[in-house]
Amino acid sequence: MVAPVAELRGVEMRWGARPVLAGVDLVLQPGERLVVVGPSGSGKSTILRLLAGLQLPTGGSLSIHGIPQTYLRLDQRHPPDVRLVFQNPALLGSLSVRENVGFLLYRCSRLADAEIRQRVDQALEAVGLSVNIGEQLPGELSGGMQKRVSFARALINDPSIPSSQLPLLLFDEPTAGLDPIACTRIEDLIVRTTQMAQGSSVVVSHVHSTIERTAERVVLLYDGLFRWAGSLADYHQSENPYVVQFRSGSLRGPMQPGEH
C-alpha cells in the first residue's frame, strides 16, 4: 500500500497563548490536488509552512511520505521533496533567471553546466517563457513573468532527493491580486506544473476561480479547524453552513468578519 504524501493527525499550532490550529487532521494522497480555503487569518498559510518544514507543530503529528517530521527542514539531513511557491515570487535579485531556476542544480549537483542549462531551458519553456530571458535579472521582468519563473524553479528536481520520491508542491495564494486573465494563466500553470512534476499539490486560496480550476478536493478551514472537506463537485452542492457562506460571501453565517 502506497503511503500518503502527507498526513496530519491532531496537529496544533499556537502563537503564544493564541491557538492557530486546534487539532487538524488531513491526508493527502499521491497525485492529488488539494485546495485549502477559508477567510483571512484562519491558519491556511500555517498549514503550508508546516508542510514545507519551515515550522513544527506544537501538538499532534505530521508525516511526509510516511516519515514523521520532527525537525525543521534546514535541520534534516535528507529532507522530503517539498517545493514551496510563494505568493511573492521570492527570486534572488542578484542572480540571473537561469541561476534562479537552476539554483539547486548549480549548488548541489555535479552536472555539467551544459546539462543544467538544458534542464533550466526545458523548465522555462514548460511555463511558457522564452529561453532567451535566461540571462536577464528578475528585476527586468514583469510581475507575471517573475511568477512564472518561480513555477519553472518548482519543476527542477533536487538532485539530493531520490527520484522515486513524488514531490509535494505548495502554492501560497498564487493568484491573489491578479486580474482574471492573469489568474487563468497561473491556475493553468498550477495544474500543469503538478502534472509535469508527477507530484501532489496543496493550494491555499480564497479566489473562487482558483478553486474551480485547480482543485480535485477542497477543505475549508475556520477558527483552527477543518469545518468541511470533499470533492470539488461536493463543494458546489454542499449545504454545510461554512461552505454556503464562503461560496456566497455573505456576512450572515457561522464565520464572523473581524474575528481574525
Sequence positions of predicted segments:
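Catalytic Walker B motif of ABC-type/P-loop ATPase nucleotide-binding domains
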Residues: 164, 169-172
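Conserved ABC ATPase signature
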Residues: 137-141, 145
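Helical segment within the ABC ATPase nucleotide-binding domain
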Residues: 184-196
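ABC ATPase NBD coupling module
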Residues: 69-83, 107, 235-238
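H-loop/switch region of ABC-family ATPase nucleotide-binding domains
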Residues: 205-206
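Helix-to-loop junction immediately C-terminal to a conserved catalytic motif
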Residues: 52
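A short, surface-exposed alpha-helical micro-motif characterized by mixed small hydrophobic
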Residues: 211-213
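Conserved ABC ATPase "signature" region
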Residues: 114-132
